[in-house]
C-alpha cells in the first residue's frame, strides 16, 4: 500500500469513527486533571488504559506517588514494520474547577474546553 492509499485508509477510519472519537474527547476533557492533580490525571490515564486495552495493546502502568501515573502501551504488529511513537501528557495547565466554568462544548464547528488543543485533543 502506498502513502496515498495509507492516508485515504486513515481518513476513512477517522470519518467512520468520528462520533465515538468526539465522545471520548469530550469525556477526557471533562475530567479534572490540572497541574499536580494526581487523582484527576490518574482518572484520565485509567480511561486511556481502557481504550488501549480494547484495541489489544499490551499496557504497563508506571505509578508515581506524587505525580500522575504513566502509561506505556504497545500495539501488536510485525517487528520488521517501522514503528510509530505517540507521546503525550494527560494533565492540563488549568487549575481545578475549570470544567464547571468551561466544560467541553462544540460551537460553530470548534471545540472548547480545558486541554482540547493540547494533549487531551490528541
Task: Name what the model sees in each region.
Residues 2-116:
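Acidic/His- and Gly-rich active-site-bordering loop/insert found
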Residues 117-122:
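Active-site alpha-helical elements of protease catalytic centers
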Amino acid at each position: 500500500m502506498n502513502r496515498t492509499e495509507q492516508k485515504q485508509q486513515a481518513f476513512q477510519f477517522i470519518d467512520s469513527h468520528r462520533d465515538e472519537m468526539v465522545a471520548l474527547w469530550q469525556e477526557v476533557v471533562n475530567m479534572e486533571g490540572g497541574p499536580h492533580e494526581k487523582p484527576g490525571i490518574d482518572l484520565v490515564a485509567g480511561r486511556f488504559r481502557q481504550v488501549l486495552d480494547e484495541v489489544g495493546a499490551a499496557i504497563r502502568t508506571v505509578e508515581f506517588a506524587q505525580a500522575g501515573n504513566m502509561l506505556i502501551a504497545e500495539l501488536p504488529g510485525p517487528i520488521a514494520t517501522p514503528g510509530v511513537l505517540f507521546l503525550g501528557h494527560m494533565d492540563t495547565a488549568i487549575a481545578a474547577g475549570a470544567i464547571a466554568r468551561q466544560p467541553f462544548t462544540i460551537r460553530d464547528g470548534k471545540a472548547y474546553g480545558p486541554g482540547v488543543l493540547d494533549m487531551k485533543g490528541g
